[in-house]
Design a protein with these regions (language model features):
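Gly/Ala-rich beta-loop-alpha elbow adjacent to hydrolase catalytic centers
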Residues: 349-353, 357
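Catalytic histidine neighborhood in serine/cysteine hydrolases
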Residues: 468, 517, 522-559
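Conserved alpha/beta-hydrolase "acid-adjacent" motif
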Residues: 507-513
């Protein structure tokens, strides 16, 4: 008989980030309100509590107007930058000189290109900037316009960086903010200054603009109604994505555990447990049949289990990181041990799921729990001191602002989360898409990966607050200060072999940050650096064009090699990294034999539903 799970919905923990317990912290509908504290004693205590609630409600209201960006964090950063720049006459003089040189440089280019249209540009865009690659940008007056924009962009970068005394975090924030402002006013974003759009408008008689207006209205109506982007209806979990055959063999208040049907006559005895991130739905690893990592593993003779996380509502606001470890990873392992008894498990975690798996593995190592045969981490961070531009949104002020937003809602909404990720690549994900769809009138063809990306989830208030404060801000996991069941864990306790994958252009988990696990454990590590980004680099099936990777092994207790040296000396291999991982799993597995049965009803784990289950279908 499966163990009945405790009801976590009604617990009232310490308010996230405050360290104090407040009665009535959760309203009947899971939302925080001014009337949530009727039982607090009168006097100064109630005054403090009510003042705190008023502040939180005001911040939550402000967040709707500022896209959840803390105005205080921006003001502090700009104040730091402005004060130090104002007290740096040498820097000011250098900036004036740079401006004069750029002005002369632009005028010289303008005079030459007027005589010789083939004159090389006076400044080239960055390699990742694809806004001005079309040949029509090399014609007057558009070449002069975009060259002036690039020179101005370069000058502002010089103006916001390299000022003595400015806190590095504030410098990055100001530079990032100025880049966002400049991107808004890029000549590629406007009809009158974008020659590609102008020529298309002339050739189509303006019909492209008509289509663009129609697209904008369609998208606006869907956004207001909270519906997914147009085209996502073509990809439905269980119909044409997440179609690998399987059964839900365990369910609790937080997860469904899926066991996939074997497709080979024999399988390796060690099962594979995949712990995906709960920031999105699990089926990124089981997309279409041709690019499903799950189907690929099953086809190579492995018994695969997948955690499917529930999409939390306001009622589940008090779920904690410990709940995700206990009700997620540990309960899944218990079920797998019942279905595949006496067999160690290959555990694989993706993104946030990999971080959680590392926490669970360190706690298991501390407690001498040896159920993990190997650990695979896909684009997963364990050390957060250099976690990339995402940390710009995660200072103390910004996290407090997010906490107040989540306190009022009970969770972090999908749109609030996706907005931060889009800003990290605003050129590609916001402005270029806007130009294509609303000025050129072209719909971006929907793909399975894009549809999955639109199928976002919510993050519970307490869990997300703990994740941001304890991991991103305090870096407790890497510092040996993260506690599980009241005692600290250390990644150095992990002895199981580790296979680690990072992606070259990852803006969520930068590969150098992922690489830092080499400093935190002496376990043997096989490290893979693959082409692509956070998602596309992982969904990299064999035969995918343009894929390549680097791979090297560090034995247990081997010497440390810094990431730059590692990248320089490790050869590049063409193709997908999937076969290398499957080969590594096979090396750490026993010889194939008879497949285990589906589920274990006699042990309390019957088949509950067909894959993909119910939780993945929840809105």
């Amino acid at each position: 008989m499966a163990e009945k799970e405790p009801d976590v919905r009604r617990r009232v923990p310490a308010a996230a980030g405050s360290g104090t317990v407040r009665r009535g912290d959760v309203a009947r509908d899971g939302r925080g309100t001014l009337n949530d504290y009727p039982l607090v004693p009168s006097g100064s205590a109630v005054d403090e509590v009510r003042a705190d609630i008023i502040d939180r409600l005001v911040h939550a209201w402000q967040a709707r107007l500022t896209l959840s960006v803390s105005p205080a964090a921006l003001m502090i950063a700009f104040y730091d930058w402005g004060m130090h720049l104002g007290n740096a006459p040498g820097k000011q003089a250098a900036l004036v000189e740079k401006a004069a040189r750029k002005w002369v440089r632009w005028l010289t280019y303008l005079s030459r290109v007027a005589i010789n249209p083939g004159t090389p540009p006076c400044i080239e865009p960055l390699p990742q900037d694809k806004r001005f690659v079309d040949d029509v940008w090399q014609q007057l007056p558009f070449c002069a316009i975009y060259q002036a924009f690039l020179l101005q962009q370069q000058w502002w970068y010089n103006a916001t960086t390299g000022i003595r005394g400015v806190a590095p975090r504030h410098e990055r924030t100001v530079a990032f903010a100025m880049r966002q402002i400049l991107d808004v006013f890029s000549p590629s974003n406007f009809l009158a200054t974008n020659p590609e759009v102008l020529w298309q408008t002339f050739s189509e008689g303006g019909y492209n603009l008509f289509r663009g207006v129609r697209h904008f209205i369609e998208d606006w109506e869907r956004a207001i109604a909270g519906r997914k982007p147009i085209g996502t209806e073509a990809f439905q979990a269980g119909l044409n994505v997440a179609t690998t055959p399987g059964k839900v063999v365990y369910r609790n208040e937080l997860i469904e555990l899926i066991q996939y049907v074997p497709s080979t006559t024999t399988v390796h005895p060690e099962p594979v447990l995949i712990v995906p991130a709960w920031i999105m739905k699990y089926y990124i690893l089981d997309l279409s049949p041709e690019n499903s990592l799950v189907r690929y593993l099953v086809g190579k003779g492995f018994t695969v289990f997948m955690i499917s996380w529930r999409n939390p509502t306001a009622e589940l606001r008090d779920l904690s990181m410990e709940d995700y470890r206990r009700l997620g990873v540990l309960k899944a392992l218990d079920a797998i041990n019942a279905i595949c008894p006496n067999r160690p498990v290959h555990a694989c975690g993706y993104c946030l799921g990999g971080t959680l798996l590392t926490i669970a593995a360190a706690a298991m190592a501390r407690d001498q729990d040896d159920r993990l045969k190997t650990i695979t981490l896909l684009a997963a961070e364990t050390e957060f001191s250099e976690a990339g531009e995402l940390t710009l949104f995660l200072g103390a002020s910004q996290v407090a602002y997010l906490e107040d937003t989540m306190w009022e809602q009970g969770y972090l909404d999908t749109r609030q989360m996706s907005g931060a990720f889009q800003l990290l690549r605003s050129n590609d994900l916001i402005w270029s898409q806007g130009v294509r769809q609303y000025l050129k009138g072209e719909r971006v063809p929907m793909t399975d990966l894009m549809a999955w990306n639109a199928d976002a989830t919510r993050m519970p208030y307490r869990m997300h607050s703990e994740y941001l404060r304890r991991l991103f801000i305090a870096n407790e996991l890497a510092e040996g200060q993260y506690e599980v069941e009241g005692h600290p864990i250390a990644l150095s306790d992990i002895r199981a072999p580790i296979f680690m994958v990072a992606t070259l252009t990852d803006h969520v988990a930068p590969w150098r940050s992922v690489y830092k696990l080499h400093l935190l454990t002496d376990a043997p590590i096989d490290f893979v650096l693959t082409s692509g980004g956070h998602n596309a680099g992982i969904v990299s099936e064999p035969g995918h064009p343009g894929r390549s990777y680097q791979i090297a092994s560090r034995p247990a207790g081997g010497r440390y090699v810094d990431p730059e040296t590692w990248s320089a000396i490790t050869p590049v291999v063409d193709g997908s990294w999937w076969p290398a991982w499957v080969g590594w799993l096979a090396e750490h597995s026993a010889a194939p034999g008879k497949a285990p049965g589906m589920a274990a009803p006699n042990a309390g784990f019957p088949s509950l539903a067909d894959a993909p289950g119910y939780y993945v279908l929840e809105p």
